């Protein structure tokens, strides 16, 4: 082999070795980087259970790879397994209620495009709370807002915003509805939306953004539902619906829905004579509702729903300090737990209460005749003792000189217990305020607290003279 061939051979071998070494270095670098960034490994969940994420410890030739802390690199996260809500935690023990939210919709309408609404309510998923209301298909500063005192028109839609966000022009219209209820089962939202002719309305059941089922009027007399949140336990949601006379016997049915599909319908049973606009809350393993008797009683009906066998019972709140409006004064009002009290029972307003052992927390208008003012208090023995009237922990939410309206309950699951919250509808405009032609509302929201609290009043606050006519 001549000298030139030797040089070429040595060069080729050297180049080959260098290339192999270079490729090995790249492979080592890629492996090191991959192992460094893959800090957590998530096993696929089996049987719908969450599997813990554990650090991977890797040893190579007695060299421990140590993961760096405080890096700016996003770590891989285990996917959360979505489960149905079961509401099995106990009810929070509270001393009263603390301010939570106020949307100031009417005040903002004086200078902005805000929807005309009524029948508001609040409901929460796992992460956030949302406010709902039935819009009138118009903003307030719009001639279409004239005569919006009417409840049922084909332009009404269910509006949904994050709690505290007024219903502006960008608000989502969930469905067509002049009566509604909404709840989250842990996986998706269910909306019950009623619209159509008074004598032949349709209830649409919308789950996870899709229409899944429907039901038509069964008594041809204004099919209607709660105007507050429904309740879901272990994937089954329940909602109370009524069709029939608003001042006489009506046909109330309790529907059970799974992922938007009606799976069972139970008739109302028990001693309640008339049931409308129920405010429902989870009372594991069942659901309990406090409703409106628009026929015979100013004491509120109670509907107990068994979620396992679909059975229903009903009665009345025992408290002699009754919750509906209009009502007798507190000295002459009565309730025997089982029957309507036949005291100014005709007419009424949506309201709420909830049991606390033998006692009952409740809210009502301060006026016994009008939807004015709002107060809350606890009645000792008000859940178990007929005509109990011992009141403690009274709070004024809206002073008696200002208007209120519907009110209802919603539940919020905490780390160790389930808290009860309520909202108050603050109605403005017609019929009482005849300077304007519209009727709309804002809301104020309070939640139960185990702490201390002060005093105040949280009315709508809009100067009617500043408002569009």
Curated annotation (Swiss-Prot):
Signal peptide: none annotated. Residues 11-33 are annotated as: Involved in apical transport and lipid raft association. This is Neuraminidase. Belongs to the glycosyl hydrolase 34 family. Its main location: virion. It comes from Influenza A virus (strain A/Aichi/2/1968 H3N2). Homotetramer. The influenza A genome consist of 8 RNA segments. Genetic variation of hemagglutinin and/or neuraminidase genes results in the emergence of new influenza strains. The mechanism of variation can be the result of point mutations or the result of genetic reassortment between segments of two different strains. GO terms for cellular component: host cell plasma membrane; membrane; virion membrane.
């Amino acid at each position: 082999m001549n000298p030139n061939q030797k040089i070429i051979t040595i060069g080729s071998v050297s180049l080959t070795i260098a290339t192999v070494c270079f490729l090995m270095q790249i492979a080592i670098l890629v492996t090191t980087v991959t192992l460094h960034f893959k800090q957590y490994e998530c096993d696929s969940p089996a049987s719908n259970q969450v599997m813990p994420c554990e650090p991977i410890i890797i040893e190579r030739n007695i060299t421990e790879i140590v993961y760096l802390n405080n890096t700016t690199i996003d770590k891989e996260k285990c996917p959360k397994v979505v489960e149905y809500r079961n509401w099995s935690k106990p009810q929070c023990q509270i001393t009263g209620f603390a301010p939570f939210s106020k949307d100031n919709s009417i005040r903002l309408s004086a200078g902005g495009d805000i929807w005309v609404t009524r029948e508001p309510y609040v409901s929460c998923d796992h992460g956030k709370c949302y406010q709902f209301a039935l819009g009138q298909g118009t903003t307030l500063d719009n001639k279409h807002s004239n005569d919006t005192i009417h409840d049922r028109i084909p332009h009404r839609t269910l509006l949904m915003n994050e709690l505290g966000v007024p219903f502006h022009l960008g608000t989502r219209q969930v469905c067509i509805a002049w009566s509604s209820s909404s709840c989250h089962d842990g996986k998706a939202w269910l909306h019950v939306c009623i619209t159509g002719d008074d004598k032949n309305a349709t209830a649409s059941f919308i789950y996870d953004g899709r229409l899944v089922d429907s039901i038509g009027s069964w008594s041809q007399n204004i099919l209607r539902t709660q105007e507050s949140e429904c309740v879901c336990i272990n994937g089954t949601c329940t909602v109370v619906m009524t069709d029939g006379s608003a001042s006489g016997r009506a046909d109330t049915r309790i529907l059970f829905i799974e992922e938007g599909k009606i799976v069972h319908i139970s008739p109302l049973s028990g001693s309640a004579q008339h049931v409308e606009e129920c405010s429902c809350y989870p009372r594991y393993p069942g659901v309990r509702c406090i409703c409106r008797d628009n026929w015979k009683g100013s004491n509120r009906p109670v509907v107990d729903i068994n979620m396992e066998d679909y059975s229903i019972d009903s009665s009345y709140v025992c408290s002699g300090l009754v919750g509906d409006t209009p009502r007798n004064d507190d000295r002459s009002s009565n309730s025997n737990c089982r029957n309507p009290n036949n005291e100014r029972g005709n007419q009424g307003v949506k309201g709420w209460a909830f049991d606390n052992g033998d006692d009952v927390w409740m809210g009502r208008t301060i006026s016994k005749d009008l939807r004015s003012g709002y107060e809350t208090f606890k009645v000792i023995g008000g859940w178990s003792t007929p005509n109990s009237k011992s009141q403690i922990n009274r709070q004024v939410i809206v002073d008696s000189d200002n208007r209120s309206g519907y009110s209802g309950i919603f539940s919020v699951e905490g780390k160790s217990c389930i808290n009860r919250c309520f909202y108050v509808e603050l109605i403005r405009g017609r019929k009482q305020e005849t300077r304007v032609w519209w009727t709309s509302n804002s809301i104020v929201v309070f939640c139960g607290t185990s702490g201390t609290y002060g005093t105040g009043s949280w009315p709508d606050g809009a100067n009617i003279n500043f408002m569009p006519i």
